[in-house]
Amino acid sequence: MLSFATAQAQTVTSPNGKVAVILELVEGGQPCYRVLYEGQDVVERSALGLKTNIGDFTQGLVLKEITQKAVSDTYQLRNIKQSCVDYEATEAVATYALRDKPEMPVMDIIFRVSDRDVAFRYKILLQKETRVCVVTEEASGFALPEGTTSFLCPQSKPMGGFARTSPSYETPYTCDEPVGKNGWGEGYTFPCLFKMAQDQWVLISETGTDGGYVGCRLLNEQGGTYRIGFPQAGELNGAGATSAAVALPCETPWRTITVGPLANIVETTVAFDLTS
């Protein structure tokens, strides 16, 4: 296991060397990442972090350490595209503290980089006597290169459709459209597919969500930059919350990014790799 807390940018590479993630802490103490496939940016520098009621973990951070190790798993599932899966990846855990309290770690960002997928999630650490917190916003972003087009399912507004259950049903997909829109004003439902130059593709989704966290969507900020969005306030007739109340320590669901040629998109098993 390697530990290199002093570096400002670190690279995490897949076992076959084709996929790489570059982790950075930029001006203002903001954690960011990039994703490369065969040396080309498929996700440009994008934000990371969480906002909670016990602290803003999107800025003002210092890096305490990063560790890397190889991980592997073999599992079988019925009725999916591949009956026996051999999963291999490089795992990196970056630990951060607030700049004004550098002695106390507050959050880990955990990355898994396999031969066709990148996945990341957050772990909010215990804060002295604090045992619970509310996650109010996730800063996780996905900045896609210029010229990218999209294949997306717009999320409908709440309290419409059959028995007023929207957005529980799929809406018509838009195909090969330029990026820069926000669907019908409420973003997009996962999974979200994007096409780039040189026949490269990116599929963004989530996995590992359970009843202890909110299901999320993808919002467009501007141009080719998207970010994770929490539920709309009117969903389920207003019952439930648009934020996540969690017991500490807490790990969030995985954000997944499948990259490369279209075959990688079709063959990915990342939704099961991380939850088997």
Q: PLM features: residue spans?
A:
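N-terminal accessory beta-strand-rich subdomains and adjacent acidic, glycine-rich linkers
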Residues: 11-275
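Bacterial Sec-dependent N-terminal signal peptides
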Residues: 1-10
